[in-house]
Amino acid sequence: MKIRPLHERVVVRRKEEETKTAGGIVLPGNAAEKPSQGEVLAVGEGRILDNGDVRPLAVKVGDKVVFGQYAGSTVKIDGEELLIMSESDIFGVIEG
């Protein structure tokens, strides 16, 4: 199944959780922090401005992005957990 977000929404696959600390300690599943980075899988057509024009989104499919820990809504599609969030919930794009 494919999902197409509407307007200024973006679908993001969250980066895998870290299961080890930098010091090598293995974390149990409930202790691992959810990463606040991910990959953009789909984008909406853009924000509808007051004059009716559509402003395209600044992010595109494939971008690696940083967002707030509690940003977006989690949905499960074909057994995979994805986030649907507004473009304004994204803090920046990781380049390089």
Swiss-Prot record:
Keywords: Chaperone, Cytoplasm. InterPro entries: Chaperonin_GroES, Chaperonin_GroES_sf, Chaprnonin_Cpn10_CS, GroES-like_sf. PROSITE patterns: CHAPERONINS_CPN10. GO terms for cellular component: cytoplasm. Its main location: cytoplasm. It is found in: Cytoplasm. GO terms for molecular function: ATP binding; metal ion binding; protein folding chaperone; protein-folding chaperone binding; unfolded protein binding. One of its GO terms (biological process) is chaperone cofactor-dependent protein refolding. Heptamer of 7 subunits arranged in a ring. Interacts with the chaperonin GroEL. HAMAP family: CH10 (MF_00580). Belongs to the GroES chaperonin family. Together with the chaperonin GroEL, plays an essential role in assisting protein folding. The GroEL-GroES system forms a nano-cage that allows encapsulation of the non-native substrate proteins and provides a physical environment optimized to promote and accelerate protein folding. GroES binds to the apical surface of the GroEL ring, thereby capping the opening of the GroEL channel. This is Co-chaperonin GroES.
